[in-house]
Amino acid sequence: MKLSFILSTLVAGALAYNEFSAPGPNAVLQEGGGVNTVSWSNLTSSTVTLTLYRGGNSALTPIETIASDIDNTGTYLWNIATYYEAADDYLLGLSFDGGETYSQYFTLQACSTCTISTSSLSYSGTISSTSIAPSMIGTRTSSSYFITSSSSTPSSSSSSSSSSPSSSSSKSSSSSKSSSSSSSSSKSSSSSSSSSKSSSSSSSSSKSSASPSSSKSSSKFSSSSFITSTTPASSSSSGAIVSNAKTASTDDSSSASSATSSVSSVVSSASSALSASASSASASVSSSASSDASPALKTGINALVAVGVVSAIALFL
């Protein structure tokens, strides 16, 4: 009786409590492949918590709580999600009142029709690395991915998010500078245009100030056109004179002297008419010309009138 009690006590002491039986060493579990059965034996404690770990023997780190405070029945149906990175350094931990046990290392990978997504992992306890002997869980030399990724990802995210505004602000400042430059250039072009317009205005002013001489020239041309317009009248007079001359030539020789004298009188009257026309033209030119007309211009006009008179007389003769 005493011997059997001692033997049962020794056997119970040699057995580990809540020892994992599945998953087995180096098992391959499919993410998204359906329900996987997790089992353990030599039960103790009324409730247990199931946790997923990852990492090497010297840096084993909890990454997600699978089930918290479940009844200690020795089994759990685990429907593996598809957001775990495919790797071979996963294991399960079972915590209970008085201790914790671990499974052997196993592999997680996506099923043939599944795609691994990304999601935030949730762990309810304090994240700290644990060292477990290879004789208990197997051997892995990889370091903790969770600590590395969790510490680097937020910082990289914050750095990228912090760099984005600066980049945006630098772009905004560049855009502002560009718009300022374009505005300045447009203002410069406007100033250039204004200066060009000012120079044009000054040029127009200079042309306006030079208008008296052009007025004199136009007056000169007006006098010329006036004289030219008077020329047809003198031509009409010469036509009348020629007609009279032809009439006189039909008379007999006895009246030739009287015809000659009549021609002379007509020439005299034509000369008087041309002189009067020239005088009126000169008066018109003088009235249309400005008060500051040069003597040379007046002399030219008088000479032009004289040439017209002489030409008319020569035509009659």
UniProtKB/Swiss-Prot annotation:
Name of protein: Uncharacterized serine-rich protein C1E8.05
GO cellular component: cell surface
Organism expressing this protein natively: Schizosaccharomyces pombe (strain 972 / ATCC 24843)
Pfam families (UniProt xref): Kre9_KNH (PF10342)
Signal peptide positions (record): 1-16
Domain of life: Eukaryota
PANTHER family given in the database record: GPI ANCHORED SERINE-THREONINE RICH PROTEIN (AFU_ORTHOLOGUE AFUA_1G03630), MATRIX PROTEIN, PUTATIVE (AFU_ORTHOLOGUE AFUA_8G05410)-RELATED
Residues with attached carbohydrate: N42
Region (Disordered): 150-259
Entry keyword set: Glycoprotein, Signal
Biased composition (Low complexity): 150-238, 247-259
